[in-house]
Regions:
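Conserved helicase motor core of SF1/SF2 NTP-dependent helicases
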Residues: 1-272
Length: 272
């Protein structure tokens, strides 16, 4: 402090010293017990919460009663709030290298088809769910923006006709597409997570924290698109494969989660 008063120390150094003193005092005064983990889920429908609760939080998360009955998606096309569209039996399921990234056209076309079905169902039941599409790769983001351009315009028109979308930034543009970074701190009623990968090592997407954030953006409906069998057993250079836990949970909880064979949805698939 004397060095700062004499102009010999920068404010940043003083701030660091001050912070260090606070931390040291915390330890010295034994107030670690005041630190606690946030254990209540105020965002997601309980089935969605349980998907990442078991693998990533050791089952400690609890869904608040404050959102009970307020997170149903009320759509007829899905019978759960957790849905995996499994591409394992698709002949065109493999991802491709583009520059330093990856793309998966099969997944993109399936998402396009899913969005058309969502729009039809939302129109039928007068629902206005906000939608976000998350994918690990920027290259896939660009492909999705291209393939989904038509349906995005249709969603935008639908929202404008059926709600005051100018007052809701999540509806204004139809839906959002991006990597998890663009969804940090936000959520959507419906999240579609595009796994992209269907071959090779999955090091880039095997980040547990980023996967956790991606899945936990959904409030009412979480749709995962990807090759379940591959992702369950995929190899990583270091650490564990987090998809193993997710796939295991979904497969063991079919009463709570819905698995749809993407191969059965080939007929009538929209090409964008």
């Amino acid at each position: 402090e004397d060095r700062y008063l004499n102009g010999e120390a920068s404010p940043s150094l003083v701030e660091r010293l001050f912070l260090r003193r606070i931390i040291n005092n915390m330890h010295e005064n034994h107030i670690e017990h005041f630190k606690h983990r946030l254990i209540y889920n105020y965002r997601a429908e309980d089935k969605i919460c349980q998907l990442y609760n078991q693998p990533f939080y050791d089952g400690e998360l609890k869904t608040s009663q404050a959102i009970e009955g307020k997170r149903e998606h009320n759509l007829s096309i899905f019978n759960s709030s957790v849905v995996w569209i499994n591409t394992n039996r698709r002949s065109d399921k493999r991802d491709k290298q583009v520059g330093t990234g990856k793309i998966n056209r099969c997944n993109a076309l399936l998402i396009n088809s899913i969005l058309y079905k969502l729009k039809d169902d939302m129109q039928k039941y007068n629902l206005k769910h906000s939608i976000g599409i998350i994918t690990p790769y920027r290259a896939q983001t660009n492909l999705l923006k291209d393939i989904l351009s038509k349906i995005k315009k249709e969603f935008k028109d639908f929202y404008q006709k059926n709600s005051d979308s100018n007052q809701d930034k999540d509806l204004r543009n139809g839906f959002d597409i991006g990597t998890v970074d663009s969804f940090q701190g936000s959520d959507r009623d419906i999240i579609i997570y595009d796994c992209v990968r269907s071959g090779g090592r999955i090091d880039f997407i095997a980040d547990e924290k980023r996967l956790n954030v991606s899945l936990s953006r959904a409030k009412k409906l979480l749709i995962i698109v990807g090759d379940m069998e591959f992702l369950y057993s995929a190899t990583v250079s270091e650490g564990e494969n987090p998809f193993n836990k997710i796939v295991y949970y979904i497969d063991r909880n079919k009463d709570k989660c819905q698995i749809i064979d993407a191969n059965a949805n080939t007929k009538g698939e929209k090409k964008g």
